Every structure is written in C-alpha cells, then in structure tokens.
Amino acid sequence: MLAVCARHGPAKLPPPPPPLAGERAAAWVVGRWWWRPAAAGRRGVVAARASFFSSRIGLDSQNYHTRDLSQLLWVGPVPGDIAEIEAYCRIFRAAEQLHTAVMSALCDPETGECPVRYDVQTEDLPVLEDKVAAVLGCMLALLNRGRKEVLSGRSGVASAFQGSEDSTMDKIPPLALFRGDLKRCCESMQVALASYLVPSEARGLDIWRKLQRLKNACYDAGFPRADGHPCPTLFANWFPVYFSTVPDDSLSDELEVAFWRGGQVSEEGLEWLLLKGFKTIVDLREEDVKDDLYLSAIHEAVSLGKIEVVNLPVEIGTAPSAEQVQRFAEIVSDSAKKPIYLHSQEGISRTSAMVSRWKQYVTRAERLATQNRSLNGNGKHVRNDQTEQLTNSPGFSSEGSENGTPLESDRTMEGETCDIDIETARHNLEITNSLPSEQSTEQGELHGTRTELQSNFRLESNPLKAQFPSCDVFSKKGMTDFFRSKKVYPKSVLNPRRRSNSLLVSRRKQSLSAEQNGAIDYEAAEFKVLKSSNGASFDNDYILSVASGITNGKPSNNGASTSVEDREMETSVVTVDPRTSDTSNSNGNAPLGSQKSAERNGSLYVEREKSDHVDGNMCASATGVVRLQSRRKAEMFLVRTDGFSCTREKVTESSLAFTHPSTQQQMLMWKSPPKTVLLLKKLGDELMEEAKEVASFLHHQEKMNVLVEPDVHDIFARIPGYGFVQTFYTQDTSDLHERVDFVACLGGDGVILHASNLFRTSVPPVVSFNLGSLGFLTSHNFEGFRQDLRAVIHGNNTLGVYITLRMRLRCEIFRNGKAMPGKVFDVLNEVVVDRGSNPYLSKIECYEHNHLITKVQGDGVIVATPTGSTAYSTAAGGSMVHPNVPCMLFTPICPHSLSFRPVILPDSARLELKIPDDARSNAWVSFDGKRRQQLSRGDSVQISMSQHPLPTVNKSDQTGDWFRSLIRCLNWNERLDQKAL
C-alpha cells in the first residue's frame, strides 16, 4: 500500500495524563450505553449506533496544507494530482485484500475445502454464496471502471474541468464518484456477508476487519497526510484542528493542537488511539452502530478507565445545537481530557459543522473577554482572573443536548436542489436557541459581560452553507491564479451543484459490459472515446500476417514486400514431427533454415487490426508463420508439420490455442528475448532464498522485469536491494498473460496447478524447477536453473526449446439448466464428483453431447486430462496416458459394479455430470483438488476441452521427460533384471 506523506512534520501529541482514580461504571439507559468514571464529576455518553448506509451529503472539507475548512472533503484532490492516484491505489489494495479474505472463507485455498454452516439449510447456501459472488463481481467491475476513469483518464478529466464556469458546476471528479459507488457496494457486501458468515468465527472476524478498512479508504477524501498520522484505512479524513488560525505557509509544528477530527472508529482504530494515549472520543453519530467488534472493544476500554467516550448525537444533514457546541468547547478546554478525537461516520459534514461552530464560539468568547478585560460597563478595568473564570466557567455548558432545540438548517437531501449564495452564507449565521444561563454572577462587573456574550453567541450562520467556496476554481482565471500561486492545492474547489436528473440517469445506465467492447458512454463526464465507423473502438496494434494471395509458393505482388515496423518482441513456435526430428536436427539448422527460406519466398503486408479474427489461407510452405502478437509481450508463431506437409493454426490474441488434436512435438523460438517473467513459489515462507536468487539472476544478468504475487511482493519489499520486484493484482488476472512472457515455478506440481489457476485463458510458457515433494511435472533441477533459464530466454537460437501443450478441461456448473455466474474453471489435472461425507452411494448421470451414456453409482467419478492421468485417476485404476495424446479419461471411483471399467474418450467429447432429482443425497465437486463445493439435486457440471492449453518447457523432449518422471516418481516397471539362462 502506498504510504502517504505531506510536507509538514508529524503531529506532536501531549504526554498522556496519569490514569484517573476509580473504576468506570456502565449502565444501560433507554437503549444507549452510558459510561462514566465512578469518582469523576463529568459524565460521558457514547451511543452504540452507526449508519448502515453512509450519508452522501458531503458538504464540508478541510485541506491539510491550508487548514481551510471551506475545502470539500468529499470532492478530494484536484483531478490529475498524484494524491488522486495514491488514493485510488489504497482503495484498490484494500478491496483486493477483502476479495482474497472472502474467497478464502468461501473455499480454503490450501485445502480446497468449502466450509458449511449447519445452522443454515443446505438449499439456502448456494443462494447466499451467489449474493456474495455477485457483490464481488460488482466490486471488481467498479474497480476496473475506476481505474480507467481515474488512472487512464487523468488528462481527459483535467481538460474537462477547465471548461466554462457554468459547465464546471455539473462536474464531479471521477475519484469522488468512484468512492461513492464503492461505498454503496461495501454496504451491500456487509448485508450479504451478515447472512453467510458468523462474525464470531475467525474467518468472519478477518473479513469484517478488512471490510472496515475498505470502507474507511472509501470515506477518506485522499488528501496527503503528515508522518506519524494514521493510515487512511484506520481513520478517514484525519486532520488536526489548531487553536489559532495562521497563514498557510506557517509551520504546524509551532501550533498547539486542540483536538483531532476524522471518520468512524473501528476496533483497530481504537487500538491505535489507546496506543497513542488518547483520553476522550467525541462521537457525533446519531445512528445505530452495527460494529459489534468496536462496541465490545470500547466497552472494555471504558470499563478499564483507559478512555472516555462522549456522544453528542447529531442527525445526518444537520448541524450541532448550541448546547452541543458548548459541551464540546468545555471538553476541549479541559486539559485532563486531552488528547481528544472528534468523529462522525465519514468525518465530513457533521464533523466540519462542529469544528466551524466551535471555532466561532471560541473566537467570540475570546473577543468579548478581551473587550471586557479592558473596560467594564462602568469604564473600569476588569481583573484578568475574573475574565478567565468567565470563559472557562461551567455555567456556559450543559450536560447534553436533550433539552436543546434542533437546528433549523437547510439540507441537501436526495431529490432536493440547493443553490447557495456563498458570500451570504458565510456572514448570515443563524441559531435560534441561545445559551442557558444557570449560574448567577456574584461580581456585578461580570454580569454585563456574560449577558453580552450570550446575546452575541447566536452563530449567525448555517455552517453547512458556510463551507461552500467560490465556484470559479476551474475557470481560466481561477486556474491561472492557481498556477501562479504555486500552491499545492487551490483554496477552494468546485461548487457541487446537484447535477440534473438526466445526467444522473444517463450515468447510472452506463453498462459495465460496454467497457469490454471499448465503446463506453462517458457523456456524464464529457469523456470521449475514438470509435470506428461501425462503432467499435480502434486498437492500435498492427496485424502481421501472411498475404492470402500466395499461390504455388509465389507472392501475388510480384515479389514486392512491404516493410514491417520493428515490434517490441517476436517469437515463433515450430512444430517438428518426432519421426524426422533426429535427421532434420542433426546439423542443428535444418528447421530454421527451411523456415528462413520460406520467409524469403513469401511476402508480408501490414493492415490495421479490427475486431474480427484473422482469416485466410493458413497453409505455409512459403512462410510458415501465423500472427500472435501483443505490444506488451513477446510475439509468438505456431507452426505444425509432419515432415511432408505444413499446416498453420488460427491463433487468437496472445494465446497458444488448440484448433484440432495433434500428436506432434512443438518447439518454441524467440526472435527477440522476452522481457517479463512471472516468478511463482510454494505457499508460505519456504523457498524465499531460492526465489531471491532467481529474481536477482533474471533482473541483474538477464535484464528482465520480475513479477511476483502480492503476498510474496510484501516480503520482497522488506528486503533491501529488491525494489525492482513488481507485482500484480489477483482480483483481475484477465490481462495477465499480456504482460508476462513466461512463468518460472519453484516447487512441485502444486505450483504448476496454481499457475494454471492464475491464467483463466491463455497461459504463457511455464518452466518449473523441482523443489517439491514429488514433482512429476517438474523436470528441471534447481541446481542448473541458470543454464535452463538462459536456454528458455535466448531460445537456443538454432534448436529452439521443446515444449508440451498440456490440454486443460473447461468446467462450468449449471443450476436448473442455467449457468451459474463465476462458476467456470480451467482444470489441468482432473475434475472429481464424489459423495463427500454422505453415507449413501452417489448417483451421477453422465451425458455425452446430451445423450445419457451411463449412471455412476459408487463413491464418484473422475474426468481427467492426459496430464492428470498419472494423479488421482491412476490411484482409482485408470490408465496412464502420454500428455500429448488428445483425450479425456473417464474413471469411476469404487463403483458398485463388477463391469464398470475406466474408459478413454476423445478430446471432442462434451460431458455432463448431473445429480438427478431422485438421488438420495447431494454430491461434491472439486477442481484440481481445490475449490471444492456442493452440488445439489438438479445441479450439473459440463466438461469439455479448453481452447487454451498450458505449455510446459521440457528438459529434453516430451516423451523422454514423461518416462523419466514415471520411473522417478512412481517407480514404473521397476524390478530386478532377469538373469540369463
């Protein structure tokens, strides 16, 4: 997570006062918790309430650099500022951590077990899981849209804000819109998780804490913070409030902090406050607090006398009453209660209103005290001690706001539009209720002073309106003044005039699916997307392919070839038949020479890439290449030949794909070295030394970019000298194959299975080093990793690198005949349907192309790939099949039949395993031994060959490696030699 700092130093907290004598007592009063010290004279009240849906009425703000409360916290940094990028990255990382925790709770990533709640009916669990998965999908879509709008659209947004003054009224920065949408998504996630998880469980506690961190990150406006201030995921909108108002360029270290302000307090936030010595928390929330962890922690802290909690309930959208302001001023003036933390739900509107009124109250009190210190009503001087007694007199305060009159203030709620005159609002302060007068004045010279102070303290203002700045920030004149001033942030930002209903409706109707097509309607924010004549967005990649007009090996353009742009990366894959590989490779140059000669006889042309696939004559005796390119990764070509003829496959974007079964051997060649490698290792802290050694070699000697998983990146980030290691976000790996040229795995077969799970579509070539317990698929020894990696990176330049395209299975779960969202899996080993812990035999109907072929009555059934034929399928009695044989293995598990034997199906088969309605019990399904989940009656799993195989780099050749693994791992056909007669 990005650390956010500012130009000011850390906040200086006064030393904590000694602990108060006596114990604190707790009592339940009219639905509220009242906590007070038994021996103390003051009472503090905290309401156990919190808002379920956060208020969207962010009308006030504060900027750390200027300490100007006219800033709008809900607007956030200026569009295009680096603080905006940092704020988005914080939210992204918090959302990723929540996503990982939720997915781990749904299904344990190590064991693959999906825990079941026995207090919920089995039929209701899939519905609850669907709700959680739906919210996760919505959150992911919002993050992707926010990334495009906040990160990619910085220049476009900044230019949109530099328009006319009238149009600026209707503009809200993309970060503010993104935070608002994600806040509502967090509330939906809280509702969904409340029905699925038990908060008292360990997994429930972890998810709840991460959800609170994400909510705080969304509440926070994103302004920079000083060193020593808490992280935005602990406290949103954390700012110090000073006693005096000074110019912007003054150092905050020289000022005395009156108190701190910010957003809601969570369990982790309370722990931080106690660690820093805070003595008082002032809670402005009027809503019910639904955070049971926080309520339990604060109750314990108050009962032990560690902290005091005072509740001054203020309704959402209103300002505090005069009695509440008095009460708060009394708390601030009491040095025994410092440090003090003032907060509301988000730390925006109600908190800013209280700060504004407190400052006005203190300023007026000081001014009147100064006047009466010079002259009293009779023209005589007033003693200073009496004046100070007046300003700090308890008679100015009340014990609560129960007897106060609610403030009549203009509100901006949904459906209302407020046009606010800024200058009028700043000077037209109104409060109808005056201060209580409970204490009589013994000195006659003080009576006039007190009466004048009470009559003047009417706060002739609506503080919510008073926070609005001028509305010409992004005008030409305003921006010119801003750049000339050389300030980090302007003194005011745009007026958040409510947008018209049509713009709101048009933005809400934006389809998330439209982003995938590249044609997004950004009318609400005046975003422009270049489109082609047919509406599809342009892609600037160039198509490199062979001219379809080649006949008899001769180019149709009389031998003239078009010059091709130098691309960043180029690769080629040559397919060699094992029958001719020995003779053709004897001199080491035969395949390459034939390919070069073919390229000399062919002609290349360049055309603009469109949305449709590349078609045309793929036969390639003239050239033998097919386009496979991305500007961000190495370019690859796939050619198949049996030594007599040459065929070429139609390959989609950045993928090594099957178009028909093949028993030929493939060879990988890079025309230019790759640039990016993904380094994967076993789970946990194991193999970190090996990972450091490989990462250093790849970066320093081979000049490659090294990517690791986020958890591993956190470890590397704490090791000096490994700042070059990069990471990616596990929430969205849809484009990871476009960034990675090949994958290096450290561990056993489980790491390769994990790599297969990371890449849901295309998979880059995988080279694995055996550091696990079995390592059937890992044919490379770690001791020679430098030589093996160099052979892969440089392609051996003449012979290439032999690879095996390992078939995967595409599995999809259906319920009531409809596909379940998010239930699509690519399997490298096998998919298993079994009875689980049920006492009855499982009954599974097996269909092939919608035709019933058999019913499995036993412990279950295995559908395995050739790669998985040496795993669970072998243990169940299935055959062991070479990984290059295109087939599926159908193996029963302990069938209740003497005639049910394993069978092998072609790779064109489309299987469906269904739990019939008359089955005695439900079944369970697992994919590669993980992601285990329940199948109810009527559910089914459809299985077919995946278009995207997993290419693994061989040590020597695919057949030799396979037999060596059989002998090394399974002791295949090991016996003593027969002696001669």
UniProtKB/Swiss-Prot annotation:
Entry EC number(s): 2.7.1.23
Region named Calmodulin-binding: 319-364
Gene Ontology cellular-component terms listed: chloroplast
Region of interest (Disordered), residue spans: 369-413, 551-601
Biased composition (Polar residues): 387-406, 551-563, 581-596
Subcellular location: Plastid, Chloroplast
Catalytic activity line of the entry: NAD(+) + ATP = ADP + NADP(+) + H(+)
Enzyme class: transferase
MF-aspect GO terms: ATP binding; calmodulin binding; NAD+ kinase activity
UniProt keyword annotations, A-Z: ATP-binding, Calmodulin-binding, Chloroplast, Kinase, NAD, NADP, Nucleotide-binding, Plastid, Transferase, Transit peptide
Glycoprotein is among the record's keywords: no
Family in the record: Belongs to the NAD kinase family.
UniProt xrefs under PANTHER family: NAD KINASE (PTHR20275), NAD KINASE 2, CHLOROPLASTIC (PTHR20275:SF6)
Function: Involved in chlorophyll synthesis and chloroplast protection against oxidative damage.
Name of the featured protein: Probable NAD kinase 2, chloroplastic
Species this chain originates from: Oryza sativa subsp. japonica
